[in-house]
Amino acid sequence: MASLICKFSGCLQSILLREASCCSRILINHEHKRYRKRSRKPAPWFEPRKTGKLTYGVTDENVADLKQQVWEDSFKPDSPIRAEFLERKGLTDNMIASQYQVDKNFKWKFNTKRTGVIAIKLGMIPQWTKEGEKVMCTVLQVLDNHVIRYTPPEDFQKSQGFHPWFSKNVGSMVVGTLSCSPLLFSKRYNNLFLEAGVAPKRKLTRFLVSPECKLAPGTKLRACHFRVDDYVDVSAKTIGHAFQGVVKRWGFKGQSATHRGGKSWRRAGATGGGRSQAGTRRGKKMAGHMGMDWNTQKGLKILRMDNKYDVIYVKGVVPGPDHCYVRVMDTVLNHRRKGLMKNPPSCPTLLEDSAQKLPSEVLSSDLFDFRDDSISISAE
């Protein structure tokens, strides 16, 4: 009888433990992890751009001579950017021909990922269609873009910048824009551009690319990387508005302006739940820092392009203030990418020889060209 009671108690205990392990009540005191939305810790691959001012007894005349030498070597009026400014370190012409050889027989596929470009937002300007409809466009200029580094997929998976939700068949390509004098940056930052053989860039960013779309370091990227009537995704940091309340940040209605009570006109009200939902839930719309977050506008159509000045006119609005850096890349929307199957883009990019043969300005078939006659009257 005693052994039967022991077996029954052991069986009952195992059942209770099994039910307790599957029941959510054991997490009744669980606290959600709180973390900062904006981390102050720099990325692990971050290199300091500037260092302390070290003169080492150099006179002002010597500094002027160094600046003049930098200007003559890299920023001459006849050649704004020279690829021979810095000698390539660890990358010869034979290695470029073998490792970064462009496969001319490769055809663009639906899941192919090309590199993007860094542009500067110049503002907005209206355009008109042939039917007379007004369309607001954002003007983006692609200035001095060069490929700085390419990391193959097998090496990119081992890096600290790789995330588990990335595809294992993508590599990393670093693109820089706006060449500057090397006297403005630290030595560690200047060493990042030795492999590409270009002047130090003011802005760097990273794109995920397919192995078939890899480009050699030092390759120049222009606005003709895209085409008119293509759809692109544009991402940038939104305009910062500092600390704002719920009315401006989230669009709360607020209380009555005439019969409000005290200082509760623009307050958020209750922040907690009921009896069973005590405490503030994650994601509650509250007052806080507004703006300065990365935002992406997807599926923007290119209506006009100036190949001479590398200017792109995209339909719609783009996040960020004027004169900010934006990332322009091929769209990820499936219903927009299906149209590229009939007319695929150039992979990995449009070569410099082919870019010189393009017309200076290309407009969409829907836009009206103001150089043409709007009204034609036949003589009677």
What positions do the PLM features span?
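N-terminal chloroplast transit peptides
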Residues: 1-23
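Extended basic (Lys/Arg/His-rich) segments that typically form rRNA-contacting surfaces
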Residues: 27-380
